[in-house]
Amino acid sequence: MDKALWVVRDKITTKGAIDDLMADATTRGIHDVVVQVRGRGDAYYTSSLEPRAEGLPGDFDPLAHLVRAGAAVGVRVHAWGNVFFVWSSPEGALPKSAKHLVNRHPEWLLRSGGVKYLDPVGGSDWEGIYTDPRNAEAREHTLAVFTEIVTRYRVEGFHYDYVRYPQATYADSPEDHAAVTALVSEGAKRLRAARPGIVISAAVFPDPDLARDRVLQRWPDWARASLVDLLCPMAYRRDTAEVARLLTKARAAAPKTRMWGGLMAYASERALLRDQVRVAEQAGCEGAILFAYDPAHRDLLDVFSAA
């Protein structure tokens, strides 16, 4: 069974943190880490297209060190890029960099019914600022960013997250429903051309019907067309029976595509997580991936030791 971790960008800001990540992975037989290097339209790597992430110290290149450190210990590094989700701020502040696409190209941003993009549309369900999936220039920029990453860095794979609309209320035409898949389709061509053999993966809503109807994420279509090599349905539930139901349904929707069951690593609930890893395997998943790596709760990674 494949064992993998999602690693959020705030856990890779120093060499020491990355070295600790690799040590934690190797001691538990974890050979794949999916690491967030494009979180909010910014770069945790050296980029000519997007600004350096705010708060990233000095001239440190996290992705370069990840690739080197992973190669030294046999851990495969997958670069994780948020696709349409490009900014969020609890205070409603804009990015500091004038080069950030939110500042450079506000015309690319998704709006609903004329509402300003910084206003919380949908109350507590509002996630942040998205680019409009229908906007061809925005899609082109995003694909150029992803291609830059896989060209410059010897990553094992590229991982899409937020490859969807925030809510179906933003969509009202057939073009809306095709826009997300248009990016995934073009991405498959470009990333595979830039780095032959690359593993293209996506984090997806686990129920394919809800994914289609609520956020216009038609991931079973991507699987059938071989646009992705690996799917990670995010079955984030404490109810293990519900996790089993969701992963079984996901497996049936894409029976020929490699799949890792996405599980929430709830703090202090190691027994629950161990049961859910077992459930993912029973549902037919080739592996499990935990959200998310946290050195403060590294004991949760021990669930993989017995898997």
Where in this protein do the model-derived segments appear?
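Aromatic- and acid-rich polysaccharide-binding/catalytic face
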Residues: 156, 160-164, 215-241
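Catalytic domains of carbohydrate-active enzymes, especially glycoside hydrolases
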Residues: 17-43, 151-157, 227-230, 282-288
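Substrate-binding cleft of secreted/luminal carbohydrate-active enzymes
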Residues: 227-245, 249-250, 257-307
